[in-house]
């Protein structure tokens, strides 16, 4: 039931799931059960959303008001002894296509029914399957949840800190103080587990089976190249049916260069892989999959468009030194046996080296990097990525409008011109004694030529503009990932500065501050390596995009010129 509350302090919302409250403002609280220190309610202006539980007091009828105590809840105060490390049996937050967070309930991995990939329906996606009470946009719970009990605890991944498993060599009893945790437990810095990693709360594994190396290159830190590079083609989209035609889907033939046989995968399989990638690779910009479509998904144009974009997606995946080595990706590309397929799927879903734990797999260079220089470099890339995102959107808008003109306006105008020429030819035939058959035929042919040119304009986007839009769409997705990734590094920088200040004030021993700085270096090297890889791919992809566009434009206008030259010669002997 709803409760009355009063705001103790001012709070200003930072995203659309939160609402602003003012000191002494009367509030309606939907439930006094908090999630990570947040309550949902309504302010005096009628706005519904989330606000910090520690900022309000509950007003109980007939009893003096007391400040609500949430310290006993699993999502208690920032100083509560809980670990944000996600246990492998519970899904951890992942970045969505548009940069927002969510939690995916994996359920039991032992149920064979869940592993029957043929039963997956193209009408829904893995990403769209959070249960009621999962997190919505920006990681907050959906605002339409019913109360009480709107925040089921099974979606949150908490466990006590292992006292002897901290990454610091220093026991917690020797610490003078601890760096404060973020109040906003829904920020991507917290949800990703990077805060826990920076503070040393991610337990070291006894044995880390996978490692990814970062080395110094001519432009700074870079991912060490995949020792076994490969490529993979995506071709032959084929409509398949099952259950005697009740269900239909499109399968794609994938042929990796390092495998003996091709495999056939549905879009739903790509979707599962994409969800695993988001779940695991915290500081890597995972390329977005082509968009889904509820209707018309068996139309030829849509199938061809999805195929083109899956080719680009696959090319980016195989060229990435880290993503291309991921065991789940290799299993996706090579497994032919049904039983082995299900076992590999379960292995990927039980992978412990995800989120914050993934950062333990990095081997970084020994070279010293000044953190201020790294922060300046990140700020430069942040400004660059924002400007590039704006310019990619602008070019995409212009190119899309040009496609519409090719298919509509240009074709119609050339057809009108051709029809007008033919009308002239027909009028010349009205007075037979003075009719010139050769001239009439030439003018009529000119009209038909311009009608054909109109059709050529309508077909031309398939040769140039579509490929441009495909590349721009891929980069819109990649660029949309970077604000969250950069936010992780910014949060790490803030923890370093805070720990150093506390050390200078004598509230933290220097060894612990050094540990935070050391782990911040790991995140910094990883982000710089990802920035470096992005620039390498950007230069290559945009070079190919521009070359293809210009070549196709030249060929197109050469064909138009040939048509006009052929028509012109008809007038030479009149």
Swiss-Prot record:
Keywords: Cell cycle, Cell division, Cytoplasm, Cytoplasmic vesicle, Endocytosis, Membrane, Mitosis, Phosphoprotein, Protein transport, SH3 domain, Transport. The keyword Flavoprotein does not apply. Detected in heart and pancreas. Its main location: cytoplasm. Residues 109-119 have a biased composition (Acidic residues). The modification Phosphoserine is found at residues 77, 92. Belongs to the sorting nexin family. This is Sorting nexin-33. It comes from Homo sapiens (Human).
